[in-house]
């Protein structure tokens, strides 16, 4: 997993490969899980050894997940590929 997911208004192959993690991040956020717990369990990151990196990876992927769930899903539903 990259530290920062792709940006932009197009669903990428990277997004497709990490869809499960994106959905799990959304679920964790909705359930009130701490970012540390989500980063450790869902993303497999060591929040003790690399707290800044773990926070960056978590926050940027959660942001991308939110975009996918509010906008990007339309591309998936329409069958768009890049």
Feature locations, PLM:
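Major-groove recognition helix of helix-turn-helix-like DNA-binding domains
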Residues: 24-25, 48-72
